[in-house]
C-alpha cells in the first residue's frame, strides 16, 4: 500500500487541521507543504493536477498519486495505522461515528462556514457576500450549539464515550468560527464547554 509522502496544508484552514489532528492522534508524522490558498496557490494549473477542486488538504503518496478530501485522507491513514481507532472498530460503531461526524459536518461545520464566508472581512472581494444571510446562519450555529450541549449530557465525547473523528470535526468547526466569526460557546452550555475544554487539552489539538 502506498505510503504518505507529505500533506499539502494551510495553517489556518479547518479541513487540513482535521487531518493534522487525526494524524497526531495516531502518532503519524506528516511533512507539511504550505499552500497559500488566499493567494491562489491552490488554483494553479499545477495544483489542479493534484486536486481538481483546487483545495487543501491533499495527501501525496509515494506511488505518485494524490488523495484529497479530509475524511477520505483520514480513512486512508486509519487503514495504514488502525490504532488508536478513530472511525469505528465494527460495523455498528463505524455507522454510529459516521452518523455523528456527518451531523457535525452538515449541521455545524457548514453553517459556520456560511457565516464566515458572508460576514468575515477575509472574504471581502473574494466572494459576493450576503451579510444578512450570514447573520441568519450565525443564529443557526448558536441553535446547533445549544442542541449539541443537550446531546453531550451523559457523554464525554460527540459519538459516545471515546474520542473519534466526530470530535475532531466539531472542534475545528467551533475553533474556526471563533477565530473568523467571533462565535463563542455560551457559558451556560456547561456540557459543551466541558467537552471543548476536554478535547482542546489533548496534545493533538495543537497540530
Where do the language-model regions lie?
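GST-like domain detector, emphasizing the conserved glutathione-binding G-site
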Residues: 1-131, 135
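GST-like fold's C-terminal all-alpha helical module
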Residues: 104-198
